[in-house]
Amino acid sequence: MLRTHLAGSLRAEQAQQTVTLTGWVARRRDHGGVIFIDLRDASGVSQVVFREGAAAEQAHRLRAEYCVKVTGVVEVRPEGNQNFEIPTGAIEVNVTELEVLNESAPLPFQLDDQAGEEARLKYRYLDLRREGPGHAIRLRSKVNAAARAVLAHHEFVEVETPTLTRSTPEGARDFLVPARLQPGSFYALPQSPQLFKQLLMVGGIERYYQIARCYRDEDFRADRQPEFTQLDIEMSFVNQDDVILLAEEVLTSLWKLVGHEIKTPIARMTYAEAMRRYGSDKPDLRFGVELVECAEFFTDTTFRVFQQEYVGAVVMPGGASQPRKQLDAWQEWAKQRGAKGLAYVLVGEDGTLGGPVAKNLTDAERDGLAAHVGAKPGDCIFFAAGATKSSRALLGAARGEIARKQNLIDPDAWAFVWIVDAPLFEPTADATASGDVALGYSAWTAVHHAFTSPKPESIDTFDTDPGSALAYAYDIVCNGNEIGGGSIRIHRKDIQERVFKVMGISHEEAEEKFGFLLDAFAFGAPPHGGIAFGWDRITALLAGVDSIREVIAFPKSGGGVDPLTSAPAPITAQQRKESGVDAKPEPKGDAAAAKPQVSAEK
C-alpha cells in the first residue's frame, strides 16, 4: 500500500507516530509561511502542516484536488486550535515528505459549493469525492451486505438471471438490442426477472434472490431512471404471511444501519381502506389528516357540484387564514392534476362558514358540516366531487400538500404499512390515463402484472367479474413511498390462461410470448410467491436524500440522458449495417409460402 493509515482514522492516541497518508487536497491555507492542507481520502479528512524543508517548498505548488502522498509525524494540536467538528480535529500531521501523485486541472465547480445537477452529473467522478455523494454510495454497499446476510442465514441462493432475453409484455416498453447474427431479430433487456425467477421455482431452487438490474423504456417522469435496481426474492411453498415475515426481517436489518428499530409486525391496511382514508395506495402515515366521506351528508343537497357519486373532504388545519392569492393557487394546483378546481369552505374563528361554496349550502348543511368533517375554527375544508377514484386521488394529493405547507410531518419519523387486497384488474383506460402501458387488448388489464394470483376467494369468479377480483398481492410503504411489492404467483396453467383471456391476450399470442412459462407450469410447478424491493428508493430513504439519483453511482438525468458519457448517442453507418437493425425478418407460415419463387434455371 502507498499509505500506512487512512486520513480519517488518526487520533490523539497516535501522537508521535510517523505515518504516510494519501488523498486529495481539499483546502489549502497559508499562514506566515506555514502551509496547512486538509487532506481528504475515502475515510475523512486530516490536517497536514508544512513548516520547513523541501516538503514545505514543494507545498507552495499544491492546488485544489491535487492527488498527493505525504509522510510526517502525528502531533496533538496546540490548545485552542482543535476542530471538534471532525473526528481528527485533535491532531495534525507535521509533514517531512511530499510526493505529488497527480495534478488537477482547474475545477468546473468547487467541491464544497452547491453545484447544479447537470454539472454534478457531467463530472460525477468529482461529485463523488464530496462527503454526501460518497457517503450515499458507501451506504448502498452496506445495504447490499445487510440484505445478503439475512438471506444467506435463511439459505437463499443468489442466482443471476439473463439480461438478454426476449420481449415479453410486462407493463412497460422494452429496451431492444439487435441480434447481429440474426438480422431483424432483437433481444430485450428485462423489465424484471419475473419470469425467470418463477422458472427457478419450477426448477426446485425454492429460495432465490438477486440484486437485479431492471430496464424500462418509460416516458420520463420525475425521479425515474430507465435502469434501476431491485432486491428480487422468490420462495416456493409459501403463503402471503411467509413472504411478509421474511421481508420484515430484511427491512429491519436495513433500518438498523441508520439506528432505527422497526417495530414488527408492521401494520396492514387493505387497498380499499387506504384509498378511502388517504386517497392513495401508498399513504404517508407520519401525520393524521384523513379524507372524510361526504356523499351521504349531502344526499339532499341543492348544490349541483355536490350532486355526484362521490363527495369527499380533507381539512387543512389553520388554513382559513390563507390569503386569497394562496386559495387561487390551490385552484391552479388542482387543474394541473386534471381537475376543474378544488372547492373550499373557510371556518371562521366564530365557527361561521365562509367562501363561495358556503353560500350554496342550506342552513342545515352549514350547521353540521364542520362537525361532520372534524374541522375547527380557523381551518379550511377542501372538497372534491365526481368520479370516486379521481376525486379521492385529488384529495389524497391535497392531503400531502397540506402536510408540507403546515409542517405536519416529523422528518425523523418512519411510518411503515403493508397495503393488501388490491384489485387484480383495473380498467385499461385508467391504466393508460395514468401513464402506464396496459398489457393486453381488452377493457381490463392487470394492476400489478399478469402473473399475480387472484386471492383464493376470487379464483372461481375473477374472469366473470373482473372488477371485483382481488389480487393475492402486498405492497410495503414507507413514509408515503412504495418501497417494495410482491404477490403469490399463479402456478397453474389453466388459471394463467384464464387471466390472459380476461386481459384480451389470445391463446396464440400467449403461446408465442409466454409459451415457455405455460409449458413449465405443466411439470408440477409448486405454489410460490415473492417480493421485489426498490433498492434505489430504499437507499435514498436511508441516506436521507430526496432523489434516487443521489444513491446511484452514475445516474441518468431526468430526461434519461447521461451527461457524463453523452448517452444515448447515434450509431455509425457501419454499426447500423452490422447490427441488422434495418433488416426485415423473413416471413413465416402462409406468408412465406405465398412469396414468389425465383427459378434457379438459366
UniProtKB/Swiss-Prot annotation:
Any one annotated GO CC term: cytoplasm
Binding locations of ATP: 216-218, 225, 482, 534-537
Ranges for region Aspartate: 194-197
Compositionally biased spans, kind Basic and acidic residues: 575-589
Keyword Nucleotide-binding in annotation: yes
CDD domains: AspRS_core, EcAspRS_like_N
Keyword check for Ligase: yes
Gene3D superfamilies (alphabetical): Bira Bifunctional Protein, Domain 2 (3.30.930.10), GAD-like domain (3.30.1360.30), Nucleic acid-binding proteins (2.40.50.140)
Disulfide-linked positions: none
Subcellular location: Cytoplasm
EC numbers, comma separated: 6.1.1.23
SUPFAM superfamilies, A to Z: Class II aaRS and biotin synthetases, GAD domain-like, Nucleic acid-binding proteins
GO MF annotation: an example: aspartate-tRNA ligase activity
Record region (Disordered): 559-602
Site (described: Important for tRNA non-discrimination): 31, 80
InterPro entries per record: Aa-tRNA-synt_II, aa-tRNA-synth_II, aa-tRNA-synth_II/BPL/LPL, Asp-tRNA-ligase_1, Asp-tRNA-ligase_1_N, Asp/Asn-tRNA-synth_IIb, AspRS_core, GAD-like_sf
Residues noted as binding L-aspartate in the record, renumbered to the chain: 170, 216, 448, 489
Any matching Pfam family: tRNA_anti-codon
NCBIfam families the record matches: aspS_bact, PRK00476.1
Functional description taken from the UniProt entry: Aspartyl-tRNA synthetase with relaxed tRNA specificity since it is able to aspartylate not only its cognate tRNA(Asp) but also tRNA(Asn). Reaction proceeds in two steps: L-aspartate is first activated by ATP to form Asp-AMP and then transferred to the acceptor end of tRNA(Asp/Asn).
Family: Belongs to the class-II aminoacyl-tRNA synthetase family. Type 1 subfamily.
Name of protein: Aspartate--tRNA(Asp/Asn) ligase
Organism listed in the record: Rhodococcus opacus (strain B4)
